[in-house]
Each structure stands twice: as C-alpha cells, then as structure tokens.
Amino acid sequence: MPVGNSDRGIGLWAGQIMFGFDNSNEYIDWWHDVLPDSLENFEHKGAMASSILTPSVTIGLSNYINISLSQVIGYRHMFWDKDEYSIHHRTEGSNNNFINAVGGLLGDRKVMIRYLITNTGKGSGTRVFVGGGVSLPSKNTLTSDPFFLDNRDEIDEHRHFSVSDGCYKLVGELQFYLKRDYDPVFVGGAFQVQTPIDENKYGY
C-alpha cells in the first residue's frame, strides 16, 4: 500500500471495512529572546513534546463511495527550562485545565466521503480519489486568544497550546497514485485543504 496516513491510496469495495491507526510524535527544543514591550526581561527557553494518535475506520458504501471516520487523541507537554516565573510558559500538560484552557485528550473528529474515480486492485493502474468532509472540534481547546491581539492591556497568565483549536472546518481532498509492477510500486501523493467555517465560539 502507499506510505503515509493509513487511509491514503486505499479504496474499498462495497461492504468492506478497514481500520487504521496513525501515530505522530514530535519534540521541539525552543528558545526566544526577550520580547519587545514585554514585562519579562529574560530569555524564554523550554521544550514541547507531543504524541498524537489517530484511529480511523473506513467503510465501502459501494464500489465507488467510501466513508471514513477518524478521531484525534493527543497529549502535549510543555517543559519550562527557566527558574524565573513567566505568565506565558510553565511546565504543564494539555490534559489539565488552565485559566484559558479546557484540558483533555480528545482532539478533532473528522468525517470524510470519498469518490473513487479509479481504483486499481491487482495489476498496474491508477488510484484517483476525490473527497470532502468536515472536521468537528472537541471541547479541549483554548478559551481565549493567547496572544491578546484585541486587548494588550489584559495580558495575564495563559496557555498557548491544546489538542483542538475549537473550529469547525470544511475539508477537501485529492489523492492520485500510480500502481506499478516494479519498485517503487506506488508513485503519487495526496493533497488536502482544511478551512475554518467560522471563528470558534471563543472568538478567535
């Protein structure tokens, strides 16, 4: 099968069911200098570790139409590597609540419907799919703008990260793969775009 996300490049026939599981781990060692107009006159330094799991199920409604359901399950942890107190950063995890954050492990849910234009099984040929769907946010998000863009005078303790951004999004997708009888067997890729329908309920 094509490499990448577990539901990429695979079309199901009517009645078939496929379960998938994607995992992404990330570690960011970060630092930045003193911010302009900041009350904190020291460098900021730390690390951010993230582990994101995305189980999914795809069902062949017909030989040409598939539906996929997926759920993000994630955890992000900030390590604050300074002795000074900061209103911007501290050692904490995305599973816990904070002043401007609802903590938890569940992220966005996604529902996708794909039309299989071509779906080569045995032998060489193309797999071309077009799809569309919606991404549904969880409640585990930031409850205010962490950059205080609308009112700099109200800057207080806050968090910058969560497992969901709280926005409903429309999703469009195009997949194109060429299946061959020699290595590499699959050549191609997928293009996906997500766009928010509106601001989230917290206004950002």
Regions found by a protein language model. Give the residues of each.
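Short loop/turn motifs that connect adjacent beta-strands in outer-membrane beta-barrel proteins
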Residues: 7-16, 28, 64, 119-128, ...
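Transmembrane beta-strands of outer-membrane beta-barrel pores
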Residues: 23-29, 71-77, 117, 134-140, ...
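Residues on the lipid-exposed face of transmembrane beta-strands in outer-membrane beta-barrel proteins
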Residues: 8-10, 21-23, 55-61, 69, ...
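Residues that define the transmembrane beta-barrel architecture of outer-membrane proteins
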Residues: 13-15, 49-53, 95, 102-109, ...
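Extracellular loop and loop/strand-boundary signature of outer-membrane beta-barrel proteins
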Residues: 38-43, 92-101, 156-162, 199-204
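Surface-exposed strand-loop-strand hairpins of Gram-negative outer-membrane beta-barrel proteins
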Residues: 25-52, 160
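Hydrophobic alpha-helical segments and helix pairs
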Residues: 108-168
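Outer-membrane beta-barrel translocator domains and adjoining extracellular loop/strand segments
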Residues: 31-38, 79-86, 141-149, 198-204
